[in-house]
């Protein structure tokens, strides 16, 4: 009996380890800009500690969906979102949700590097200061150093912390923006074409960083580069004309997709 019980426990543990853990769940998500409908009943679950790439031709709705995940669409006049999106168990569109806190939990890195017109140090310290994450300057110094290390930037800027963040190269600025997002201890990091304005060397550094960040964060990235999606993601979702066409393991999406539209897009037959 004991042996059977132990075997049952081991089987249960194995099953638990193999269970999929979803960090964010989107159910029947539609987005309207005034009378124009941009997304149609999207159902997409984002796996925890996984890089999920959103691909599709321009105007397909991938960036629109990305912005629903931390309510960035709230900043657009006339934008309306229906359906339900949860972060863990929290409905992020519930009226009781603190949007500032939500955007700390779900950070965003934009297409064009947008450092604040402040010192490198203050770029990182700004968010933790607002959210009360540091009790004193020593705490803040540690957060700044840790965040810059996470973004692979510390060794390049540790002697220049009081210089302006806008004086960095484009690739360094983007990593500074990633460090700024990391500084408030997010659970999810959204990236909207983070490498489109960067040269190949800077792009390689950001992609390497994405691989490292996946250990501690859930990442959703919009990219127009099929090669980048294949390199950095474990899951890929294909959008077309406001619809989610399919979502699957990246390897399968690029070798044997279920939908012909995905195959055509990946092969460059439309875009």
Swiss-Prot record:
Keyword Endoplasmic reticulum: no
The organism's place on the tree of life at top rank: Bacteria
Subcellular localization(s) per the UniProt record: Cell inner membrane
Cellular component, GO annotation: plasma membrane
GO biological process, any: phosphate ion transmembrane transport
ABC transporter domain segment(s): 24-266
Sequence positions that bind ATP: 56-63
The reaction(s) this protein catalyses: phosphate(out) + ATP + H2O = ADP + 2 phosphate(in) + H(+)
Membrane topology: Peripheral membrane protein
InterPro entries, A to Z: AAA+_ATPase, ABC_transporter-like_ATP-bd, ABC_transporter-like_CS, P-loop_NTPase, PstB-like
PROSITE patterns hit by this protein: ABC_TRANSPORTER_1 (PS00211), ABC_TRANSPORTER_2 (PS50893), PSTB (PS51238)
Pfam families: ABC_tran
EC number, UniProt record: 7.3.2.1
Main location per the UniProt record: membrane
Entry keywords, A to Z: ATP-binding, Cell inner membrane, Cell membrane, Membrane, Nucleotide-binding, Phosphate transport, Translocase, Transport
PANTHER family for this protein: ABC TRANSPORTER I FAMILY MEMBER 17
NCBIfam families: 3a0107s01c2
Function noted in UniProt: Part of the ABC transporter complex PstSACB involved in phosphate import. Responsible for energy coupling to the transport system.
Protein name, UniProt field: Phosphate import ATP-binding protein PstB
Organism whose genome encodes this protein: Agrobacterium fabrum (strain C58 / ATCC 33970)
